[in-house]
Amino acid sequence: MHLVPEGSESMSTQQNGSAQKPVTLNGSASTKGQAPEAPLETPGLIQLAICVLGIYASFLSWGVLQEAITTVNFPVRPPTAEEPNPPTERFTFSIVLNTIQSTFAAITGFLYLYFSTPAGKKVPSIFPTRKILFPLLLVSISSSLASPFGYASLAHIDYLTFILAKSCKLLPVMFLHLTIFRKTYPLYKYGVVLLVTLGVATFTLHHPGTSKKVAASAAKNQSGSSLYGIFLLSINLLLDGLTNTTQDHVFSSPQIYTRFTGPQMMVAQNILSTILTTTYLLVMPHLSSTGALHALLPIPIPPSTETELASAVSFLSRHPEVMKNVLGFAACGAIGQLFIFYTLSRFSSLLLVTVTVTRKMLTMLLSVFWFGHTLSAGQWLGIGLVFGGIGAEAVVQKREKQSKEQAKALTGKKE
């Protein structure tokens, strides 16, 4: 999911439980002729606990279902005496999965936007200006292309490598900000990137133990297959970075695109993504009946005489238990997004980053115990470097924020 870029918390009207006071042109608060405003309710520990538990429950379940959908093999037909071990197949229909996910997210995002709008006020437009269509379309295309590359990489690397690399989005985001948007970073952020890169390299070089269920088949072509999987995952991360940097640009440019909030981005991006992927599923088979066009597209889907949609429906009819996982996956992702946006509007972004980073760590640990993965000391060192770097960034950001608040308080006293 690519819906909460850094900095979008500035678009909310309330943060850390406080609201901005109305200010006149001379900079003083306007109170003449008005009744004193009632203090807004400060979000308490109960709300914080609900948000944290909601994010953990939604995305831990989402992660388990994602691994179950994309890595578990199912027999093509029931075993018999003549064929006790029939061939197996795996759910590889990433665009179908992406379409279901974006549909659920668009619906839940719209419901959130509708019911969170105060009574008597108009629901904010999903596409407020024409200028915003291009960056939103770019976000939808990059996010729609990113998922197939990510899911395709799971055929060559295990889920733990996938999750650890997905925790390193700082790398492509920083690269694209430096090259496209000419944005500079403080020195400590480059140190964080170095730690994260060393952690990923350490974890990858000490190739993680595969699941007990697929260890025999994975050992046959481990080295070359893993390199190809890392290549696919690198493309996925680059597209994720393009998605996030474009979102940052939209949120930080209200003078160009008008004020645009997180829920609006959630709905708009998922609607456009659903339209794009549905069009692909319905139109592309008629344009590529021989599979030649598939080979030219930058999407790692092997050519097939069947359409992906028809193949996915056929797979789900043979394995109806997977359909439950797919629907649960989409629902957990959509609900998780709602908790993220609520947390972003009621608390600080630093808290949200802390919650999501620890959630990713718990996802990895849950994967270890749930699916029988094993980790060596080298892999644990890699994990420690990655999350140590991200944790150090959170500490520095907290100190910077405290320094800014103290400086602001001193300035206010002088005035």
From Swiss-Prot:
* Region feature Disordered, mapped onto this chain: 1-39
What InterPro entries does the entry give?
Answer: SCL35B1-4/HUT1
**Glycan-bearing residues:** 16, 26, 221, 244
User: Listed GO molecular functions?
Assistant: UDP-galactose transmembrane transporter activity; UDP-glucose transmembrane transporter activity
- Ranges annotated as biased composition (Polar residues): 9-33
- Choose any GO biological process term that the UniProt entry carries and state it: UDP-galactose transmembrane transport
What is the membrane topology noted in the UniProt record heading this document? Multi-pass membrane protein
Which SUPFAM superfamilies does this entry report, sorted A to Z?
Multidrug resistance efflux transporter EmrE (SSF103481)
* Subcellular localization, as worded in the UniProt entry: Endoplasmic reticulum membrane
So what does this one do? May be involved in specific transport of UDP-Gal from the cytosol to the Golgi lumen. Involved in the maintenance of optimal conditions for the folding of secretory pathway proteins in the endoplasmic reticulum.
The family this protein is said to belong to:
Belongs to the nucleotide-sugar transporter family. SLC35B subfamily.
What protein name applies here? UDP-galactose transporter homolog 1
Organism annotation: Aspergillus fumigatus (strain ATCC MYA-4609 / CBS 101355 / FGSC A1100 / Af293)
Name of the coding gene: hut1
